[in-house]
């Protein structure tokens, strides 16, 4: 996609899994040879067409749609936080409005859809999740990145993910959306959105997306190291407030407290 669109050649995509929105976006995420994050590479247009067969995707390994759910609801939270209290260009405002459909279907159909996907069934709920992951998130991204910047298309959850790619275990054993979904929990705690945090926490628990460092195999020491890098990631360069190490430390403490309350209930 990156090579062809840059060279003005037509590209058609045929996603066979629903792990992210890359089939419909006008951006490619570039990595260094060692697997660490390099940069987003933006294009003037997306692929010419994306051919989506939900029957094929419903029978694909479940972990891909599972991870895609985390990357998808992140779009809503990051777009709305990054654009807060700003007078937006029309195309950016359209992207923010569309991003609501990146969250709502997952909260409504996530648990049932994932259960059906585990059975290989292309149910209504599965289709809604697939379309949210691949199409809605991709379309939102096109509008949010029309000025070729990630200002409104990323945020703290992605900053957390990209900072954690410094540890080989993330790229070797975990998926992008899986870790981003965990990052959303911390981002919501940092932002003081307790009600939204609880919604996402319950969704993550229902489909077994991570709610702890242990589930993504990151040690306390590695997290402590990451809190020094995260505030300087490009994903939070455009944010309504500066991210600090203390904010991240406090958010992790609150997340652990929430998990602890559940363990004692």
Roles of regions detected by a PLM:
Residues 2-10, 189-192:
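Alpha-helix C-terminal capping segments
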Residues 5-99:
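A glycine/threonine-rich phosphate-anchoring loop and its flanking beta-alpha core
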Residues 61, 80-87, 143-145, 190-196, ...:
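Short helix-capping/linker segments at secondary-structure and domain boundaries
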Residues 73-77, 126-140, 184, 204, ...:
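Short alpha-helical scaffolding segments that buttress acidic/His motifs in well-ordered protein cores
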Residues 76, 80-84, 136, 167, ...:
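A short secondary-structure junction motif
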Residues 89-202:
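Active-site segments that bind and position negatively charged phosphate/pyrophosphate groups
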Residues 193-265:
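C-terminal charged capping/lid subdomain of soluble metabolic enzymes
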């Amino acid at each position: 996609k990156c090579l062809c669109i840059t060279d003005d050649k037509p590209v058609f995509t045929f996603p066979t899994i629903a792990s992210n929105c890359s089939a419909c976006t006008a951006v490619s995420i570039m990595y260094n040879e060692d697997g660490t994050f390099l940069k987003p590479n933006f294009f003037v247009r997306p692929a010419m067409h994306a051919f989506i067969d939900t029957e094929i995707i419903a029978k694909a390994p479940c972990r891909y749609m599972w991870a895609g759910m985390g990357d998808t609801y992140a779009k809503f939270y990051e777009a709305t936080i990054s654009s807060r209290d700003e007078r937006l260009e029309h195309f950016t405002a359209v992207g923010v409005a569309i991003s609501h459909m990146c969250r709502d279907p997952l909260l409504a159909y996530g648990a049932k859809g994932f259960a059906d996907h585990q059975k290989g069934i292309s149910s209504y709920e599965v289709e809604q999740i697939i379309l949210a992951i691949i199409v809605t998130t991709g379309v939102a991204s096109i509008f949010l990145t029309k000025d070729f910047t990630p200002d409104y298309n990323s945020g703290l959850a992605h900053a957390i993910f990209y900072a954690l790619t410094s540890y080989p275990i993330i790229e070797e054993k975990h998926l992008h959306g899986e870790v981003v979904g965990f990052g959303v929990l911390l981002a919501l705690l940092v932002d003081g959105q307790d009600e939204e945090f609880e919604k996402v926490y319950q969704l993550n628990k229902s489909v077994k997306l991570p709610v702890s460092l242990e589930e993504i195999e990151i040690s306390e020491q590695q997290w402590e190291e990451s809190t020094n890098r995260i505030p300087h990631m490009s994903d939070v360069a455009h944010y309504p407030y500066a991210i600090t190490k203390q904010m991240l430390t406090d958010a992790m403490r609150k997340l652990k407290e929430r998990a602890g309350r559940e363990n004692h209930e």
